[in-house]
Amino acid sequence: HIGLHRLPPLLRAFTRAYPQVSLDIRFLDSEVAYDEVLHGRAELAVITLAPQTAEPVRAMKVWDDPLDFVVAPEHPLAGKADIRLADVAGHPAVFPGGNTFTHHIAQRLFEREGLTPNITMSTNYMETIKMMVSIGIAWSVLPRSMLDEQVVSLPLPGIQLTRQLGYIVHRERTLSNAARAFMALLDAERGD
């Protein structure tokens, strides 16, 4: 998701400013990228941030990424008013994989309400989740930035889900000039 929806303008700016730099870019699940930085196999990762970050990893939030409950336009909950979380929980859901930070964010919301979502399938790819929702198989939680006419947002009064996107580095690792330059672009995005 980040690689398709957040990084392109930053990568464009970076490659224009530093055309001589050869980038080593790997598109990984956030949890895998976190592990790569933690174990020194990557110096910087732009990821969905973990709810808690353990030393020696340092996390910097760049974007708030609001999440919406979504269904297909023809789903029984589409267009209904006064929908409760319990109503949503009773319908089949497609969730991000159980090991993902986004899954844990949504799961905690249901647990706080004493509910269990009816998760019938999962995948780590947001675009696949959107497709499954759009054809009416299930509801899900998607980043607001992905919403279009293929899916309908469900109004759930009093419920707001947000995940944080940003970058992580290893505190005990010396970063390359290229990594520091890219961090400066990311910091400019967050207003630093």
Regions found by a protein language model. Give the residues of each.
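A late-sequence structural motif
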Residues: P155-D192
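Short beta-strand->loop
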Residues: R58-D68, W139-R144, V151-L165
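Short secondary-structure boundary segments
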Residues: L49-A50, P73, P143-M146, L165, ...
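Short secondary-structure boundary/capping segments
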Residues: T15, P51, R58-K61, L77, ...
